[in-house]
């Protein structure tokens, strides 16, 4: 064991942020479970108890399972490095303050891939039958297709003539595709510095709060769809916006959670204008679709519900909200669609609305592969949703501690995680959160 430990610390350990176990669920500061498993196998023996008092997304639990079920890449890596790990089952106890982090770890370490695949495919089929109508859209040839994603645009006002203009019309330059900092108003011809251009506000009726609210005015800008096997894109028209408004009017969202956002260090007055509750982070279409998915979970066996929840939440804050973005890459003729910017709650002037059902269908394979990697392991993992200030373990019962301690003021986990935890009905108790955070009144 001492030889392996010497090798492990002689140089930076090679690790990749790839693979099904890593990619199944995005989480701030997440590390490779395969790399951690090698450390555990080199520092402990079969049957030992591993403790992680700051569990995050449950990586230590997954890594402990992997010590009894090492992947081909792990076996290859230890051979290359000349390590002598002791493979075999161990036990892990993982404490995590975040409900979603704890749920994630527990589901990843206890779900059978075949059962998960069966019920997830049913969930997606049932929800598609209900929701595909809201993603239906007319293609450039006049046929009915399905939306893949839509780019929305803030509406700004010209500081010179007072006319309203789509932000995209001013900011986007084609051939090559780039974003401009300054542009000419199409109405008066004066120069507009986009960073200073005032966003237009509008008053709308909030169907969940049952009152009028003031929000940033946004309109559909560009649509990307598929008809049969043919992919296409086109700019949105007034008819598209009218059709969207009509389609989403009076949709049943009575089962939706009504959760007031607990703002802290991440709040920005500009791009968060009008966002007071969870549903304000979504278009009305994606709120309806995600709520429909979530409400279906209670109809499935209890022992698969946690996995279904984690599956949906893996796509939620990263890809289902207005935080989804476009970027312009050199020599690329069109926008590149990406997910939410990690570690913040940023909403751009060109937010993207993805087809949630398409996205989850693609993600299904990743989850199945992740479960397959550890489902044969005889390791045991206990997840405790609570503070590590109160670890209920007997003295001398822990053989090895592997942990990723708090990051000071780097990431306000509880503020970020509430977008997922609100759907669960339980959010992180930030009174116990170890963090430097003026909004919480916490310092060194």
Language model regions located:
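A short glycine-rich, Lys/Arg-flanked "PGG" loop and its adjoining helix->strand segment in the class I
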Residues: 444
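Conserved SAM-binding loop
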Residues: 406
């Amino acid at each position: 064991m001492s030889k392996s430990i010497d090798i492990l610390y002689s140089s930076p350990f090679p690790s990749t942020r790839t693979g099904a176990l890593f990619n199944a669920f995005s989480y701030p500061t997440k590390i490779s479970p395969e790399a951690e498993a090698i450390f555990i196998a080199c520092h402990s023996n079969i049957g030992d108890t591993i403790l992680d008092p700051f569990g995050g997304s449950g990586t230590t639990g997954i890594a402990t399972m992997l010590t009894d079920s090492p992947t081909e890449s792990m076996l290859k890596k230890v051979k290359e490095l000349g390590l002598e790990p002791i493979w075999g089952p161990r036990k892990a106890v993982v404490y995590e303050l975040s409900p979603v982090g704890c749920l994630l770890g527990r589901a990843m370490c206890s779900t059978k891939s075949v059962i998960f695949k069966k019920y997830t495919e049913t969930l997606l089929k049932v929800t598609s039958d209900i929701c595909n109508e809201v993603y239906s859209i007319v293609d450039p040839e006049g046929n009915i297709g399905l939306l893949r994603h839509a780019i929305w645009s803030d509406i700004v006002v010209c500081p010179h003539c007072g006319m309203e203009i789509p932000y995209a019309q001013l900011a986007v330059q084609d051939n090559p595709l780039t974003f401009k900092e300054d542009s000419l108003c199409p109405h008066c011809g004066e120069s507009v510095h986009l960073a200073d251009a005032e966003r237009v506000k509008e008053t709308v009726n909030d169907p969940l709060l049952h009152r009028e609210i003031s929000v940033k005015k946004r309109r559909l800008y560009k649509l990307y769809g598929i008809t049969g096997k043919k992919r296409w894109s086109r700019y949105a028209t007034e008819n598209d916006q009218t059709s969207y408004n009509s389609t989403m009017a009076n949709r049943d969202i009575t089962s939706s959670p009504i959760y007031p956002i607990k703002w802290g260090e991440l709040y920005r007055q500009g791009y968060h204008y009008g966002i007071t509750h969870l549903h304000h982070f979504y278009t009305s279409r994606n709120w309806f679709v995600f709520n429909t998915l979530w409400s279906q979970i209670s109809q499935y066996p209890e022992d698969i519900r946690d996995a279904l929840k984690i599956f949906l939440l893996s796509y939620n804050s990263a890809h289902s909200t207005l935080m989804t973005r476009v970027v312009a890459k050199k020599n690329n003729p069109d926008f590149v669609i990406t997910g939410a910017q990690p570690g913040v709650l940023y909403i751009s002037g060109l937010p993207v609305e993805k087809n949630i059902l398409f996205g989850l269908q693609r993600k299904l394979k990743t989850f199945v592969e992740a479960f397959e990697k550890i489902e044969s392991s005889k390791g045991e993992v206990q997840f405790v949703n609570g503070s590590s200030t109160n670890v209920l373990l007997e003295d001398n019962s822990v053989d090895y501690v592997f942990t990723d301690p708090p990051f000071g003021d780097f990431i306000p986990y509880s503020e970020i995680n509430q977008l997922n935890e609100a759907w669960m009905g339980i959010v992180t108790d930030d009174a116990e959160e170890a963090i430097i955070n003026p909004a919480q009144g916490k310092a060194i």
